[in-house]
Amino acid sequence: MYKIIFLFSALLLITACDPAKKEAGRLLTQEYPDLYEAVFQRDADAIFSFTSHEDERVKAQAWQALINTPVSDIDRLIEEVSKANLKEAWASLWLQELSEAHIEQLNKLFIASDASNMGLVSVLGEKGNTRSLKLLLEEPVPPNLEMEFQLAYAIGRLTGNVETTTEQQLEIVERALTSTNSKASQAYLYGFYRNRSNTEKQKLGKEAIDKMIELWKNFYPEEIGPDRYIAALLMNNHSGLVFHHFVDKDYISMDVQLAIEMIQGIAQNEKNDTYAPVALNAFLYHKSPNVVIQALRTISRKESYAEELDNSILNETALNIGVEDHVRLAGFNTSPNAKKYIKDLLTIGTEDPYLQPLRYAALKKVWDESKVFDYMIADIDTSDGLLYSTLLTELNNLWANADDELKSQERNETVNEVLFSALEKGARTFLMHALYSDENVLNENDFETLLMLLENKSVEDDSDVFRSVTSVLKNRFEERSEEVITQLYQNAGNELKETIIAQEWSFIEDSLAPVTFRTPDWDRLADLGPNPIWVLDTKKGDIEITLDVLTAPATISGMDSLIRNGDYTGVAFHRVVPNFVIQGGDVETGRGFGGPDYTVPTEASAAHYFRGKAGVASSGPDTEGSQYFFMHVWGPHLNGRYTIFGEVTKGMSVVDRITQGDVVRNSYWK
């Protein structure tokens, strides 16, 4: 008993003696609430008043709040930013609408300054013009690593947006491949890398490419980023040189991001070197499932490669029970001889909703459409929940692309039955657009049947059914539905009214109410402290994220409510884009279409989206909810546009191995 009391007392003492937590608590409970009243209104003038706050942290947060707040008086904003001269203040200009006169004003400010003003440099990178690029290139390479990176990124960003001369390209390439600062080397090349596949953008010229090849021979960056970019830039016309450059590397254990970059380069190249299939074969043995999956996708696009590598495809992936189902199905989609092993294929991924697209893609390779249709209908009849939802999507896709021969009267009737069953369950209609749009599936006689689905239904208890049925009525029977919808709207609660307004019926004149943001629990945030650690337990290992409460309090307060309620537990990573992000946290649909019952504002910052950063997904400014993502690689095009709420501080190797459908088994505070 005494021991328990002693430990509890010690914990209280530690908390009381933690000055960082104490100060964060003061800010969160005493200063932030007033600032966030202004943020919730996106009131630029009210937010401005906090930029002169006596507390530096509040001041910085106010400037960052202006990144996503439209400001009408840009002249005043530039003047105030110049006076403050903080990186957060300069960041407030990133997304504002600037005129050519404003950009020239920024150029003049830079002439009076230098590269040490990293905030101003960042704005020129985002908003600058041809003259801005010239001025930045006239700057000598700064001795400070961070300053060099910021200058390099501004130059790299601008090369993606403005025309460059041959001399400028040569200078940028030389800077990139002679720097000992890996982050800066990569940043210099950013614009060329981003534009490499864009036919409407300027490409790196022959002279600059030749210079790059010459310098690359003796370039040994400490980090993999520069090599990734160089490989991507050279793969199209110099793939043999790229393979030779990495000839001493073990492709089986190659850095995940570099391996994926090379595989994607092979996929985009019409004239690959003879070593390409050798490299792809080696990548089939890679430790990362994402590398293997990418290699399989590339092989499937090259018919001759698939024939040549089929033994490895079958033995290492499709028929290998030691690898995950995602890899096996990707293998079956790639093998030209998958039909021989249909019994094996039919046993894989039957209950995993996230594998149905791969599963049915493979079945379409070995069966005709009618057999796939019959099998799919049987699957739908015996499924529910998320699996049911994904199978509806597969049926919709099959029907949208099917030949007329498949669409017999009998199958039209079958699809009609599936459609009405789905509507009665409240399934989302965008999953079934091809089904209800087909007049042979849903005809004029079905109008009354649709109305019958709403009989004896409660608006409160069956809101999903009302949402689904009214959506189909809007798309197919808008004129006939006017009386029904008008009466329904008059008697509806707020949720159904908002649904009907969002459907944009021609006779409903009301508009959606402004979004009301969730109010943070400031006292709870103070208890969490400035940097709590959130743990996601997956079958591939734990991912630990150190959160930044003072930068994204509204975001983290909402997430905290979901974490404590167990809402993230059992929710999968529904989106995986290799060499970009993994994304999860859709606590509503599990597929990326939904979120929680609240909205929080975008909480942008002056920080970069480096590898490992944790961000919040959105469909635009101030639409954030529960979905989160972790960066595989540096993605500066997201800077200022998406909330950064923390960083993965343990488990990045797990992040690299996550594939679509991997589930968070448990989610908790450390």
Feature-to-residue mapping (PLM):
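Structural detector for internal amphipathic alpha-helices that build alpha-solenoid repeat scaffolds
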Residues: E23-Q41, S49, R57-V71, L86-E100, ...
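Catalytic-loop motifs flanking and including active-site residues across diverse enzymes
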Residues: S9, A184, L258, V291, ...
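Acidic surface patches and DE-rich sequence motifs
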Residues: H53, H286, T538
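Cyclophilin-like peptidyl-prolyl cis-trans isomerases
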Residues: C17-A20, V372, A378, T382-L386, ...
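Bacterial Sec-dependent signal peptides at the C-terminal "C-region" and cleavage site
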Residues: L13-L27
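Sec-dependent N-terminal signal peptides
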Residues: I4-L13
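Amphipathic alpha-helical scaffolding segments comprising HEAT/armadillo-like alpha-solenoid repeats
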Residues: A20-K22, F40-S52, P70-V81, S99-I111, ...
